[in-house]
Amino acid sequence: SEWLQSLAALSPDAVVATGDFLSHVEGISSALEALNPLMDFPGVFVLGSNDYYAPKPINPIRYFSGPSQITPSRPMLDWEPLVAGMTAHGWHDLTNAQVDWKVAGRLISVKGVDDPHISRDDYAGITRSFNAAADLALGVVHAPYLRVLDAMAADNAQLILAGHTHGGQLRVPGYGALVTNCDLDPKQARGLSHHRSCALHVSAGLGCSRYAPFRFACPPEATLITLTPRSSHLE
């Protein structure tokens, strides 16, 4: 919590939060307290599956057979106060939505979806297109499933920001992630890559399941991204 709060000292122009703020029925106040210094800056957010459902024990080997599944035995979390707390500070809720976002004198057209990991995404239902007059077309999603990345790329997104993968959580030195808990290639589990015509950045995030509270060769992270204008004179 203290480390997350200390990130405000970086004075970012804006904050993009890609979900999984919670994992416990009593986690809302702690999450909002940790985010409070960052909420002094403009922000947008989406939710992840752990904001809707409490985690349960799972055999880690299960992840090698494909993405984990949400079962009826996982209790629902009271996520509405979390959303209310962030929007009260002026952050934009990107749950299957598009917003035009003024940041540091620039216009960013942003489209986000609810978490594809639990099939709450509805990109086709976002009736507003990216603003053609914007300086940047930005897509935001928690779990970087290919169906959403494909839709955003086809919609002319220039940059997509995602989370969910924990960077693989357990990485093999010299090789990288073994799993992503979605259908994204493990080689793209962390950091900057490309998907079709747009840049993709997947954050390894800060935490992990309380039932698997460890990482290996994959430290928690928050990423400070600097965007620069593309020169029309580049050869």
Language-model regions: role of each:
Residues E2-K102:
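Core catalytic region of metal-dependent phosphoesterases/phosphodiesterases
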Residues L10, L35-D40, F130-A133, M152-D155:
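Short, conserved loop/helix-junction motifs that constitute active-site signature segments
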Residues D13-A14, V44-F45, I108, L136-L138, ...:
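Short, Asp-centered acidic motifs that coordinate Mg2+ and/or phosphate
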Residues G19-F21, S49-Y52, A97-Q98, V113-P116, ...:
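Active-site metal-binding loops of divalent metal-dependent hydrolases
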Residues I58, F64-W91, T95-A97, V103-D150, ...:
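Binuclear metal-dependent hydrolase catalytic cores centered on His/Asp/Glu-rich metal-binding motifs
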Residues P144-T223:
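Conserved beta-sheet core of the metallophosphoesterase superfamily
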Residues A97-A104, A189-H195:
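Short acidic-hydrophobic surface loop/beta-edge motif
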Residues I225-S232:
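Short beta-strand-to-coil "C-cap" segments at the C-terminal boundary of structured domains/repeats
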